[in-house]
Amino acid sequence: MSTAAPFEPSRSDRRAVWLLVGLSLVFAIVPDNFSLGTVGIDANHTIMQGSGLRQIQYGSLFLWAAFLAWRHLSVTLSTLRAANPFLLLVVAYCLMTALWSPYPDITIKRSIIMIGLVLIGVAVAPPVGAPRQFLRAVMISYTAIMVVSFFVALLAPSVGVDTQLGNAWRGITWQKNMLGSISGFAAMLWLREFLIRPRKSVAAALLFSLFMLVMAKSATAILVTGLGTGVYLLTRHRLMGGRHAGVMVLLSALLGCLYALLFFYVAAGRMPNVSDVVGPVTALFNKSSDLTGRGIIWDLVEVAIDQHRVWGIGYSAFWVGEGGPAQYIANRIGWMPGHAHNGFLDILVDMGEVGMGLFLACLVWHAGSLMRLFRIDREDAAMHLGICVTILISNFSESQILRDTSFQNIMFIYSSLAISGRLVQARRARLS
């Protein structure tokens, strides 16, 4: 039996966690060039290509995280050893693709950002951060952005309202879908707070989040928020007894998917494609099955995937703007997208089947870690699961996962490492 004293973080450590999580998300969501009037294509390219200010912002956070990790080196190493190994392999493979990337400088820069985000995630994971501090930091950060966006939309509609998209609100974010997405995550997190502590102020924050979600007029955000919230509500209470209940639910869901796949194959004589999967759902929102014209982009991206099927073209080396590998897409559709509008296609074009295999293994490991967390803190595990489902589903129409400073990618990395930290804490508690 261990007699080592439990780790006790200082007040400054906890403040550092709030700031590292909050600022890294704010920097990802709020434009870095202060040109809030920019919409559409130009904004997308600023997001994807980065800027000197963005490098200073995240470089400062990475140095701060490195200092925090060094201060608590033994805790950092314990969390790192318990981390999802396939997440670390994905990041390592991102860097490795610089060997054949047509733009190795871009690949290396973006890979360094991924490494830095992992460093922040390790530095702020429990026990340095409180068990639920990461999710509360996300909630407060998104709420602050929504409050500022609310006043900007009312007082400066030329900046905060997108007149080209039905007067949808975008506030101080890049575009309406981003405001809708963070409003959805905030609504989920405030709902959890209300279920734990049903107070009027919490209810008001929840209603405000839902109001901002509606005003953003993002059907995708509304859909995935509803699905993620449903997963959270269904799993936060034990539906069946036994220590293997979570595994049984997971296997039952997998079996249901396999039966649905078999039924479709027997009925249609082929495997389902993206349109078959998303069509019935998007029809509820009067959207086409290719999610408003994204289908032509997907078809064109698949041409590049076929050319670099195994290893990929190189991490973040495809969507590099005019004259890059994606130029043929711009020539066909008349404008240059910033991404494929499908995160999974972007993984394939950047990192090939090897990278996709590592990412799928990362998800399987993440699911296993969640099952273990359910035995320790069911409430927290249910929310992490709901967030994961929301991120994965939304990436069928937006490219966020594994896209360096995309805020959903940041959330996924931090969530994975926060879970690892919780599991390390639980193991130490059993041994003490």
Predicted regions and their residues:
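A membrane-periplasm/extracellular boundary helix in multi-pass inner-membrane enzymes
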Residues: 151-156, 233-285, 302-307, 315
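Alpha-helical transmembrane segments of multi-pass inner-membrane proteins
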Residues: 61-65, 91-96, 133-164, 173-238, ...
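Hydrophobic transmembrane alpha-helices and their immediate junctions
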Residues: 126, 200-201, 253, 350-392, ...
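Membrane-embedded alpha-helical segments of multi-pass membrane proteins
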Residues: 48-68, 108-120, 178-187, 223-230, ...
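Membrane-interface helix caps and helix-loop-helix hairpins in membrane proteins
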Residues: 99-108, 214-215, 397-403
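Transmembrane signal-anchor hairpin modules in multi-pass inner-membrane enzymes, especially those
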Residues: 1-95, 126-140, 193-200, 243-247, ...
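Long extracytoplasmic/lumenal interhelical loops at the membrane interface
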Residues: 282-299, 303-307, 311-351
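Transmembrane alpha-helices of multi-pass inner-membrane enzymes
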Residues: 381-432
